[in-house]
Amino acid sequence: MGSSSERRDSVLWSDIPKGPLSAYRARASFNSKELMLFWDGQDVLDFKKTIFSTLENDPLFARPFGADLPLEKERELNFLRCKRVFEYGFFNAEDMLKNPLKILVLMNCLGMYDWSLANKCVLHMLVFGSTIIGSGSEHHFKYLEKIYNLEIFGCFALTELSHGSNTKAMRTTAHYDPATQEFILHSPDFEAAKFWVGNLGKTATHAVVFAQLYTPDGQCRGLHSFLVQIRDPKTLLPMPGVMVGDMGKKLGQNGLDNGFAMFHKVRIPRQNLLDRTGNVTSEGHYHTPFKDVRQRLGASLGSLSSGRISIISISVVNLKLAVIIAIRFSATRRQFGPTDKEEIPVLEYPLQQWRLLPYLAAAYALDHFSKTIFLDLIELQRAGKVGTTVTGRQSSGREIHALASAGKPLASWTAQRGIQECREVVGGHGYLAMNRFGELRNDNDPNCTYEGDNNVLLQQTSNYLLSLLEHPLQDGAHFTSPLKTVNFLEAYPGILGQKFMASSKADWLDSEAPLAAYRWLVCYLLRESHQRYCQEKKSRGSDFEARNNSQVYGCRPLALAFMELTVMQRFHEHTHSSSVPPSLRTVLGRLSMLYGLWCLSQHTALLYRGGYISGEQTGKAMEDAILMLCVQLKDDAVALVDAIAPSDFVLGSPIGRADGELYKNLWAAVLQQSGVLERAAWWPEFTANKSVANRLKSQL
């Protein structure tokens, strides 16, 4: 009879097959199953295994290589799969209330399989449903059961054809009619059509629609959200006054039906206003708990934070999949060697390590951040339910909004660069569609622009940081926040006076070194950005121009540096906590160090310019430390990706399978494609009229 640990392992995950990757696994400094257990916990691992095995054993989820479906069929199949996911009961409300992280886990597991499927489910449950919870009142919660049971299907309609990032300029209107106690939704023209709305194209029956609220006195009360029926759930035909359609084929995620909608004087009950941030009485009087219009708008758009936090996790999953495939490939692909008779795995080359392993470290660091920021958001939503003070929610909401606004750019851009690097790392085989790099690249691409353009979002984070200097709190505590991400700024003047006095590789390998450097960097960029902004405002007299002219070399790098520090700080605390098993401390510590130094190395010029470091040797020592960490992590790389990898079926890449049989798997997949050995159906065109040269030459 096996030990309890062996029995637990067998429940958590299947044994990894023997094969060409076994040599690297044998050299690992830790047990990958122990890392799985620490990283996710048994409950989540069991949940993952259930999801993966369920998908693999259901013929509806089969995906033969090389099969391209017509757009309409792709949309149909994706909805059937979405429906099946709900039929399996994965969205168990009671279970997810006990462990909210399972919501994120489910989204990620489905996304590893197909983001069209995951996003269809997420937009319905996590975005549409969460907006009702976060922005509505108790009388709106009756819709939640209908959402869980798929009696209605939802979407989130904010963006319009002519406006996206500038939410205050949305033009859809909602005039209140006290005579009937209804709001009248209207699109003034086609440019005000709701656009790019996921699920709206073919399937949504209901939408959270953002519109400018007008009271009977003619005043515009700003952007508010309304629950609007779009289609009849029994027929899927549009409701009266609603014009709704599908946008067509996209670069990726074509199973997801993005659509548009216009409203022609559509009447909805007064109760359909999601009234957490503002309400209208039956007589038409407007009430809001917020004194400041901007604060109310921020609270109204708080649901955007959930979407952006979801995108952080989506991006991390894409990065993880690319890194898993590329590292397994690199550990089995042999090219060149010290002699003509010996070839070595390309993972043994320092250049390959330097190209890949920092992205592996980033995948771990950002994965941890995505989980923690998601749980922060859940706590904020719970605080709203139990009646936490408006001031407390505002403070937490502003901080989470700032983190989500910079977290999405950092995660999506890191994934974008990482996927491309991994595609190139595996050479020509990475260009073959069945190996998934093209799909990952296309599916990740919209993460950089939807739910807010990355460069615009970064301005919201820098505005948050600058406000700490511009608007000191009454009690004098300028730099405190509920999540403590800005608390280090209390030492702002002292940090600016610090310098990195050491210059050796060992000095950079001190786990506090990159954190201290990043704290200085954020303080330096905050000071530079504030000074630049003040100078611009003084010379131009316009706050609008001053902020725009402070972005490129000031506010933009400030927001990114602050976000990198936050991710690094959380990862460092996690990997150095007492809960880390002794056998995992070294490898996780190295991942934390590599992520920190790799990110920091991209700011070397600023560190020199600001005087934090000096001398040629200091910068070289940082580079040497990065290369040493890559060498130290090389033998652990395969085990590290094993700990975060899905099943082979879900990974869906012949060159990334766990057995490492690179060439056998790729050859088999190529031969399994439909028609691969058949003569071209258009072969007669090849044989007919052979003498074609110059036949159509111009006679002029």
From Swiss-Prot:
Q: Which residues carry this modification: Phosphothreonine?
A: T281
**What GO terms in the biological process aspect are recorded for it?**
fatty acid beta-oxidation using acyl-CoA oxidase
What's an example of a GO molecular-function annotation for this chain?
Answer: fatty acid binding
User: Where, per the database record, does this protein carry N6-succinyllysine?
Assistant: K505
Q: In which tissues is it expressed?
A: Most abundant in liver, kidney, lung, and testis. Present in all tissues tested.
Named cofactor requirement(s):
FAD
Enzyme class of the recorded protein, top EC level:
oxidoreductase
Asked whether the keyword Iron-sulfur is assigned, the reply is: no
State a single Pfam family of this protein: ACOX
Localized where?
Peroxisome
Cellular component terms per the entry's GO annotation: peroxisome
What pathway annotation does it carry? Lipid metabolism; peroxisomal fatty acid beta-oxidation
Q: Which residues carry this modification: Phosphoserine?
A: S10
The UniProt keyword set, sorted, is: FAD, Fatty acid metabolism, Flavoprotein, Lipid metabolism, Oxidoreductase, Peroxisome, Phosphoprotein
Q: Its catalytic activity?
A: a 2,3-saturated acyl-CoA + O2 = a (2E)-enoyl-CoA + H2O2; (2S)-pristanoyl-CoA + O2 = (2E)-pristenoyl-CoA + H2O2; tetracosanoyl-CoA + O2 = (2E)-tetracosenoyl-CoA + H2O2; hexadecanoyl-CoA + O2 = (2E)-hexadecenoyl-CoA + H2O2
What the protein does comes down to: Oxidizes the CoA-esters of 2-methyl-branched fatty acids.
In terms of PANTHER family, this protein maps to:
ELECTRON TRANSPORT OXIDOREDUCTASE (PTHR10909), PEROXISOMAL ACYL-COENZYME A OXIDASE 3 (PTHR10909:SF390)
**What family, per the record?**
Belongs to the acyl-CoA oxidase family.
**Entry protein name:** Peroxisomal acyl-coenzyme A oxidase 3
Q: Which organism is it from?
A: Rattus norvegicus
